[in-house]
């Protein structure tokens, strides 16, 4: 499995890669990918760590599971490949950006443009079997991605963590809120958003205001 990962992230995560749980996880994932259709493609499993260096990371958005439909997942949470129809949660993300920042809804749901600016688009589980949501949960991915959050929290300062929905909010305990900004809201899925838990959170403008206050470039959402 030829994975892409920026060297700076590799340096930070090397200890984790050598742990027994991670070796067992990778053995399981290799078997899954050889025996079943899984997403994202093998070389994109670690894509979240390949667009910006660890040093340049200034925003973390936490998702739960990759999309499990054909051709959707590209290794970045909430993102889809160019030309793929927007999933409902992504539509609601773009609607919130539209109302918050007065930006038109883009023509593509590919969020590589965010990742290139230092937004870590991290799913808690980095792979999934086709058409079986949650099929790779509780196999070790969550241990790994929790450690990613801890490393960012402990070794960086002034990062914005966007935690949407109950699952993501549980990760608050991994983050030092004395040196980072944590913004929480309901999930952008229609079930949550249509009940008033998503729209109007203004997370995108709040993120940029905080980054500018720390002397950082704002994100071009």
Curated annotation (Swiss-Prot):
Catalytic activity: Hydrolyzes single-stranded DNA or mismatched double-stranded DNA and polynucleotides, releasing free uracil
Record-level Gene Ontology MF annotations: uracil DNA N-glycosylase activity
Protein name, per record: Uracil-DNA glycosylase
PANTHER family attached to this UniProt entry: URACIL-DNA GLYCOSYLASE (PTHR11264:SF0)
Family as reported in the entry's similarity comment: Belongs to the uracil-DNA glycosylase (UDG) superfamily. UNG family.
Main localization category: cytoplasm
Gene3D superfamilies cross-referenced by the UniProt entry: Uracil-DNA glycosylase-like domain
GO biological process: base-excision repair, AP site formation via deaminated base removal
Catalytic residue positions: 65
Keywords (A to Z) from UniProt: Cytoplasm, DNA damage, DNA repair, Hydrolase
Family matches, as SMART domains: UDG, UreE_C
GO cellular component: cytoplasm
Presence of keyword Mitochondrion: no
EC number: 3.2.2.27
NCBIfam families: PRK05254.1-1, PRK05254.1-2, PRK05254.1-4, PRK05254.1-5, ung
Function: Excises uracil residues from the DNA which can arise as a result of misincorporation of dUMP residues by DNA polymerase or due to deamination of cytosine.
Localization per record: Cytoplasm
CDD domains listed in its UniProt record: UDG-F1-like
Underlying gene: ung
């Amino acid at each position: 499995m030829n994975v892409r990962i920026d060297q700076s992230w590799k340096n930070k995560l090397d200890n984790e890669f050598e742990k027994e749980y991670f070796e067992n996880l990778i053995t399981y994932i290799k078997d899954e990918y050889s025996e079943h259709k899984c997403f994202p493609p093998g070389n994109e499993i670690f894509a979240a760590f390949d667009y910006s260096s660890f040093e340049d990371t200034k925003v973390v958005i936490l998702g739960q599971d990759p999309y499990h439909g054909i051709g959707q997942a590209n290794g970045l949470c909430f993102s889809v490949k160019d030309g793929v129809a927007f999933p409902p949660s992504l539509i609601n993300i773009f609607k919130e950006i539209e109302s918050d920042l007065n930006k038109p809804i883009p023509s593509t749901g590919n969020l590589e443009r965010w990742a290139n600016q230092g937004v870590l688009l991290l799913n808690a589980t980095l792979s999934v079997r086709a058409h079986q949501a949650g099929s790779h949960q509780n196999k070790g991915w969550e241990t790994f991605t929790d450690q990613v959050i801890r490393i960012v929290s402990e070794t960086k300062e002034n990062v914005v963590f966007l935690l949407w929905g109950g699952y993501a909010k549980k990760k608050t305990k991994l983050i030092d809120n004395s040196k980072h900004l944590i913004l929480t809201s309901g999930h952008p899925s229609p079930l949550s958003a249509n009940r008033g838990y998503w729209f109007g959170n203004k997370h995108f403008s709040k993120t940029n205001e905080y980054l500018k206050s720390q002397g950082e470039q704002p994100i071009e959402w």
